[in-house]
Amino acid sequence: MAKYNTGGNPTEDVSVNSRPFRVTGPNSSSGIQARKNLFNNQGNASPPAGPSNVPKFGSPKPPVAVKPSSEEKPDKEPKPPFLKPTGAGQRFGTPASLTTRDPEAKVGFLKPVGPKPINLPKEDSKPTFPWPPGNKPSLHSVNQDHDLKPLGPKSGPTPPTSENEQKQAFPKLTGVKGKFMSASQDLEPKPLFPKPAFGQKPPLSTENSHEDESPMKNVSSSKGSPAPLGVRSKSGPLKPAREDSENKDHAGEISSLPFPGVVLKPAASRGGPGLSKNGEEKKEDRKIDAAKNTFQSKINQEELASGTPPARFPKAPSKLTVGGPWGQSQEKEKGDKNSATPKQKPLPPLFTLGPPPPKPNRPPNVDLTKFHKTSSGNSTSKGQTSYSTTSLPPPPPSHPASQPPLPASHPSQPPVPSLPPRNIKPPFDLKSPVNEDNQDGVTHSDGAGNLDEEQDSEGETYEDIEASKEREKKREKEEKKRLELEKKEQKEKEKKEQEIKKKFKLTGPIQVIHLAKACCDVKGGKNELSFKQGEQIEIIRITDNPEGKWLGRTARGSYGYIKTTAVEIDYDSLKLKKDSLGAPSRPIEDDQEVYDDVAEQDDISSHSQSGSGGIFPPPPDDDIYDGIEEEDADDGFPAPPKQLDMGDEVYDDVDTSDFPVSSAEMSQGTNVGKAKTEEKDLKKLKKQEKEEKDFRKKFKYDGEIRVLYSTKVTTSITSKKWGTRDLQVKPGESLEVIQTTDDTKVLCRNEEGKYGYVLRSYLADNDGEIYDDIADGCIYDND
């Protein structure tokens, strides 16, 4: 509270405003003596509670933690050790006060030293000042006595330069603190407190009673436990108290430098990898304990001498609060380092992990046949993965037990939490019990390996399925194409069959009656079938064909007529086949339009009746006369006795399929002649119809065409040029007179059905005109 009391002291204001921060070694020592006297004078007086210096330093509010009782205020006396803590306040407050201070004053504190221990090194009043931004405690001010030190939580980060000794005396963790203390000791003969153990806090401080109760809490926090307030200064490298003497030797030089703060910034202050090992931690613990004991003893002595227990170190919480933004920035930097370092750190050595677990037993039921394809290529990689999975899990339980504080302060520890992500096998481990019912949790590695193979096999299976689908699609496409081709071929075949049926006058389905073997090579014609000797020929039809020919088909699908003499025929089998096909054969034979193969049918029937195939008879002559064929059949082909027993009467309507007797053949001969004439008549009729149309159109003839009489052309006709309407006639040709146009010519029609004019001179004498009306029955018999 001395700081508040000194608010009315003019000297204090002057000193504050003037800010004599740049003080060399000798000047600083004289200024310190003057301040000590002021502190003693003010310590006896009761200082007012209101903080007069606070607005000067720009501190928005006094430190919550440190409020010394009124009893303690008069008892406190300015002591050089108290000046050291001001250095601590400067260290913590420097970042915030850099803008307000003179460049000289800022020089010493441009860069805050790395993480700083929570515990203040000594009972100095100023170390307790928390530095809110812009709050600057002035050591030269009257407030700087031990009473001010309790107000230290407010302390601005920049103590006056006259107290450079004190600034330097303030310990930075162990190393930096030593440098400050050495500087103050050189400048002042006053004894400096040994550097307090890190994080030690006087139990008498009211606000931080929880920290004062156990200084070891700060020590433990400084070791590696993350600072609750985000101040990473605790985790900074802890330098043993031994180094204080060495740091003191260089402190004088540092204080004289224009920027002592730059020199005082050790790289180790922000935490270094040196503490990553357990051995180093133990050494640091020993050093901290020694410094703590020494510091605690001196604190007790001073308390007894001065009787001002509240003037002890500023409360650690004040430091923690003061170090807010700067400590957070350091935390971020360390966090970045820690986040980046695990990627660079290798896995822990094998000796720390211990021996790997024994290889699990092979599962009782394992079928590796489907994995043989990929087992050779993946055997090495799978072995490595299994080893990593078995060896990596043990470290997490071992490290927390042996090195609990390391994760917060050392970058070497973060790899441990990052290990589980590397061991990404949980989904496979979940599946592994299915294949390994009798295995322990240690066997997950083997299960994982097997599952890798299973995955490979599953992948292959999926690929096979996709390939099979593609194959099926291809097959479907090919099948569709094939079906389309078959349909086209079928259509073409049907179309061809229709043409063949129309061409060869086939009715009904095409059936093979007999298989014949070619006995010679035949070069077919327009409708004849060409084949080679020994080739099999299918007999399609043996009736309704030209004389001496059958309708056959080769293996190539060609249709045509074949001569019966060019193939070898088994008549016995043909007879049986014909009997089976008798029903469909009858309508063909009954068909009156086709009679060309009737003679052949007669010959075949006669040969089959003889029982011995014999030599197939030569085809009959084109000219067939009624009666002659009947006689030949009677003479050359006697009827079998069975047919004779049937009776003497012979009927003309007996079917040829029943192999009639010669009398039936005779009747068939007459039918053949009639059929041919009828066929000719049909052709003539068609031709005549066409000619008649032309005639009516050409001669504009309407009405019924009636033949008046018939006549013949004279044999003495001379050739002449015929007109467009003249009928070309031949000598002796018979004509039918249709109309008598005039005396010179008549309209006639010849046998071919053509019409035209014919001169009367070309016609023979027509005496018959007189007898046109005589009926056939009117025949005069002179006898």
Swiss-Prot record:
Motif (SH2-binding): 462-465, 595-598, 625-628
Coiled-coil ranges (or none): 456-507
Modified residues (N6-acetyllysine): 3
Positions of region (Interaction with SKAP1): 348-448
Residue ranges of domain SH3 in the record: 511-572, 700-768
Phosphotyrosine modifications at: 571, 651
GO cellular component, one term: cytosol
Keyword check for Lipid metabolism: no
Subcellular location as annotated: Cytoplasm; Nucleus; Cell junction
Cysteine pairs bridged by disulfides in the record: none
Gene Ontology molecular function, alphabetical: lipid binding; signaling receptor binding
Function summary: Acts as an adapter protein of the FYN and LCP2 signaling cascades in T-cells. May play a role in linking T-cell signaling to remodeling of the actin cytoskeleton. Modulates the expression of IL2. Involved in platelet activation. Prevents the degradation of SKAP1 and SKAP2. May be involved in high affinity immunoglobulin epsilon receptor signaling in mast cells.
Protein name (Swiss-Prot/TrEMBL): FYN-binding protein 1
Organism: Homo sapiens
